[in-house]
UniProtKB/Swiss-Prot annotation:
Entry GO CC: chloroplast
Enzyme class: lyase
Cofactor note: Binds 1 Mg(2+) ion per subunit.
Protein name from the UniProt record: Ribulose bisphosphate carboxylase large chain
EC annotation from Swiss-Prot or TrEMBL: 4.1.1.39
Binding site for substrate: 123, 173, 177, 295, 327, 379
Keyword Chloroplast among record annotations: yes
Organism: Galium lucidum
């Protein structure tokens, strides 16, 4: 028996329930550079002090359980426990508060988003002492960031691969998303790419259904890519969705895409899971494939204001797990988001260092230590008349993705793609000439109509 164990065992063991705050509420604690920091929005049951509930969150997401156990004496709780180190009220919400929790780095497996989330959010959200709980933000320490590969390639490498600079990239989701045969699907891909788009996209629920098996879709889309490249002289791509029922099948589809010579594949990272996503990201880096990420199912997790997890946390997790693009909301269009809040997590995706800024929803300063950036994808419900606002809001390092805004053109798919490309280039040219896109956007688009269907 080690001296450490002998000493602790000699103190004795007293069973029973004790208040969490006696062990896990430590307002005097000074956070370490190696701690993972979390900001939780807590809505407690009536009559429970904030200190007790904040401590309960720290305990139940780290080393604690509902009672004292004798094996507590066999380890160092001071080394491994989570600590609620600060509590602040939520303006305008009398019953809510923000609990800040620090987790020692030793609690987490290196390079595993799966393990990080299992610890921090895996159990505590069902805690009956809380009416609701929402994870607003995480600070990932440099020491932990460096255990992740991150995106397969990143923004600059993608631009170099595509030879496209100085403007946002243009995409289109093929519609109807379900029911087309592989050949008709490939025809729509060709028409959009030939018209001037950089990418087309499988919808998130296009996998390998009876009406269109994945291998047939991959072959017809590859034919469309090569034909449009030959005719336009530009590099083109289609987000071939490799998401599958097993990791093995997913990798098999990615291997086939690589053998076809296409530049990019796609994954539904929340429904597919972080373990699968990280595996695919590693394969993509090793084999020169870009990786487009769809966030299908995100609203189940992030839509409720008081419960769940904010998308900025899912965005940080995606940058760690790996993806070159991720859908981020539009600020305009069918799925609007608060502008400042959206741009806050867009910066967390793209930039190397982001300062704390509560007005933009950024609770912690985040240093990514040169982890490659991720291109935000603005999509759903947008069209050419949104182009000035999108160009101004998202800047060059983004993907602007029009589904119905391309395929819904009265003259067909190719004219719809031409209209998008002309509108984008008109907005970029006007911006570079110093014109105000917010004030003159409508006029700029009307001028561009002279040269576009």
């Amino acid at each position: 028996m080690s001296p450490q164990t002998e000493t602790k065992a000699g103190v004795g063991f007293k069973a029973g329930v004790k208040e969490y705050k006696l062990t896990y509420y430590t307002p005097e604690y000074e956070t370490k550079d190696t701690d993972i920091l979390a900001a939780f929005r807590v809505t407690p049951q009536p009559g429970v002090p904030p200190e007790e509930r904040g401590a309960a969150v720290a305990a139940e997401s780290s080393t604690g359980t509902w009672t004292t156990v004798w094996t507590d004496g066999l380890t160092s709780l001071d080394r491994y426990k989570g600590r609620c180190y600060h509590i602040e009220p939520v303006p305008g919400e009398e019953e809510q508060f923000i609990a800040y929790v620090a987790y020692p780095l030793d609690l987490f497996e290196e390079g595993s988003v799966t393990n990080m989330f299992t610890s921090i959010v895996g159990n505590v959200f069902g805690f009956k002492a809380l009416r609701a709980l929402r994870l607003e933000d995480l600070r990932i320490p440099v020491a932990y960031v460096k255990t992740f590969q991150g995106p397969p390639h990143g923004i600059q490498v993608e631009r170099d691969k595509l030879n496209k600079y100085g403007r946002p990239l243009l995409g289109c989701t093929i519609k109807p998303k379900l029911g087309l045969s592989a050949k008709n699907y490939g025809r729509a891909v060709y028409e959009c790419l030939r018209g001037g788009l950089d990418f087309t996209k499988d919808d998130e629920n296009v996998n390998s259904q009876p009406f269109m098996r994945w291998r047939d879709r991959f072959l017809f889309c590859a034919e469309a890519i090569y034909k449009s490249q030959a005719e336009t002289g530009e590099i083109k791509g289609h987000y071939l969705n490799a998401t599958a029922g097993t990791c093995e099948e997913m990798i098999k589809r990615a291997v086939f895409a690589r053998e076809l010579g296409v530049p990019i594949v796609m994954h539904d990272y929340l429904t597919g899971g972080f373990t699968a996503n990280t595996s695919l990201s590693h394969y993509c880096r090793d084999n020169g494939l870009l990786l487009h990420i769809h966030r299908a199912m995100h609203a189940v997790i992030d839509r409720q204001k008081n419960h769940g997890m904010h998308f900025r946390v899912l965005a940080k997790a995606l940058r760690m797990s790996g993806g070159d693009h991720v859908h981020s909301g539009t600020v305009v269009g069918k799925l609007e988001g608060e502008r400042d809040i959206t741009l806050g997590f867009v910066d967390l995706l793209r930039d190397d260092y982001i300062e704390k800024d509560r007005s933009r929803g950024v609770y912690f300063t985040q240093d990514w230590v040169s982890l490659p950036g991720v291109l935000p994808v603005a999509s759903r419900g947008i069209h050419v008349w949104h182009m000035p606002a999108l160009t101004e809001i998202f800047g060059d390092d983004s993907v602007l993705q029009f589904g119905g805004g391309t395929l819904g053109h009265p003259w067909g798919n190719a004219p719809g793609a031409v209209a998008n490309r002309v509108a984008l280039e008109a907005c970029v040219k006007a911006r570079n000439e110093g014109r105000d896109l917010a004030a003159e956007g409508g006029e700029i688009i009307r001028e561009a109509c002279k040269w576009s269907p």
